[in-house]
């Protein structure tokens, strides 16, 4: 990947939150059929960890007291957003895709703390606890390969975490 392509991927984070049963938090996008993990862009001057904590708080209402980040991917996982799906940054042709750092987090608090209405704009309508591999088949098609690669990469850390639960 050349330097120009790297700059055309929006820096982003994705957070896999695991409950005491080893299930992962899976969220439905507001007014869309699409489901995904909490995710979002990295703001200027922000570290990926800071972005992961901020996005988790904004999207699902959980703060640093509610989750413990146990793993950060070393690599960036990339995906292109299809032209017909591009909005916001993507319609302005600043970015044609996203590069993501992936995080694995353990839920410390009760699931009652999950609040999809915590911040505006609201990102998700609904959430469920899902099996670890469920997202690969349920995410929008253009993210499937990225999810597969990220989940395979994180699997050893997920297995370590769930053995402790």
Summary of predicted features, one role per range:
Residues 42-141:
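Unchanged
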């Amino acid at each position: 990947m050349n330097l120009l392509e790297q700059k055309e991927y929006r820096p982003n984070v994705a957070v896999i939150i695991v409950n005491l049963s080893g299930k992962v938090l899976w969220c439905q996008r507001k007014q869309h059929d699409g489901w995904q993990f909490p995710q979002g862009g990295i703001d200027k001057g922000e570290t990926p960890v800071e972005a992961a904590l901020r996005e988790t708080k904004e999207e699902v209402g959980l703060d640093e007291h509610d989750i413990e980040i146990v793993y950060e991917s070393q690599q960036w996982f990339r995906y292109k957003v299809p032209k017909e799906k591009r909005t916001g940054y993507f319609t302005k042709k600043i970015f044609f895709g996203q590069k993501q750092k992936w995080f694995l987090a353990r839920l410390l608090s009760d699931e009652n703390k999950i609040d999809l209405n915590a911040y505006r704009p609201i990102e998700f309508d609904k959430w469920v606890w899902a099996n670890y591999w469920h997202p690969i088949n349920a995410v929008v098609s253009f993210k499937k390969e990225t999810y597969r690669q990220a989940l395979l990469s994180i699997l050893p850390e997920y297995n370590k975490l769930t053995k402790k639960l």
